Swiss-Prot record:
Protein's name in the database: Flagellar L-ring protein
Signal peptide: 1-17
Lipidated residue numbers (N-palmitoyl cysteine): 18
A molecular function GO annotation: cytoskeletal motor activity
Membrane topology: Lipid-anchor
Alphabetical list of HAMAP family matching this protein: FlgH
Domain of life: Bacteria
Species whose genome carries this gene: Hahella chejuensis (strain KCTC 2396)
Assembly information from the UniProt record: The basal body constitutes a major portion of the flagellar organelle and consists of four rings (L,P,S, and M) mounted on a central rod.
Length: 227
């Protein structure tokens, strides 16, 4: 009984050690996706006796699209990917060995009137086949802010959107690099024009946990399981 208990404890310890590390809990307000406030500019001194004030000017012909740190930009998500892969492997190996009948001084050796003539045949077969199909689509829109302006004029953007549900949360996170000339007159940009794009759409709380396999099932599906 003690031996069985000890074996059970060892197996539980090994399974716990082989289970994948749990993912870090995702929470809103991550500094990596937080909005960046605009840069503070020195306000010019007011000029007395003048109708025009440079502190409150508004250009009728200037570019009103996002181009500075802290400006808001709308990303239109139009992502669609599809992949298909099929592999097949087949191996076969046959071998045959024959041993002549043993003799001593020309007389065949036998045991219980049975000849010692031996033939050995070996045959090994292996076949494997795998098919994988995957498709993903993401559509919608999200407003992000410009977090940095690179020396070449490229804009670095980032932002997140959270939707609180009854049993958890859904979140969407976006980051990447944008060229100012790709921004439309309505201050929007297509997701396909974002370089080094990072899109994350998932769930947190009970909503995300229900779609995730337990640690024991993940162990049987991992490389640690020998079968």
């Amino acid at each position: 009984m003690k031996t069985l208990t000890l074996i059970s404890l060892i197996m539980v310890t090994l399974l716990s050690g082989c289970s994948p590390i749990s993912r870090e809990q995702v929470r809103p307000g991550d500094p990596a996706f937080a909005p960046v406030p605009p840069q503070t500019l020195m306000q010019p001194a007011p000029v007395d006796g003048s109708i025009y004030s440079s502190a409150q000017n508004f250009s009728l012909f200037g570019d009103r699209t996002a181009h500075q740190v802290g400006d808001v930009l709308t990303v239109v998500l139009q992502e669609s990917t599809q992949s298909s892969k099929s592999t097949g492997t087949s191996m076969k190996k046959d071998s045959e060995n024959s041993f002549n009948e043993a003799t001593i001084l020309g007389t065949a050796i036998s045991a219980h009137n049975l000849s010692l003539l031996t033939d050995q045949n070996f045959e090994r077969d292996f076949s494997g086949e795998a098919d994988a199909d995957q498709s993903n689509s993401l559509s919608g829109s999200i407003s992000v802010t410009i977090s940095d302006v690179l020396p070449n004029g490229v804009l670095r953007i980032r932002g997140e959107k959270w939707l609180t549900l009854t049993e958890g949360d859904e979140y969407l996170r976006v980051s990447g690099l944008v060229r100012p000339q790709d921004i439309g007159v309505d201050n929007t940009i297509l997701s396909s024009k974002i370089a080094d794009a990072r899109f994350a759409y998932s769930g947190a709380g009970a909503f995300g946990d229900v779609n995730r396999a337990g640690w024991l099932q993940r162990f049987f599906n991992s490389e640690w399981f020998p079968l």
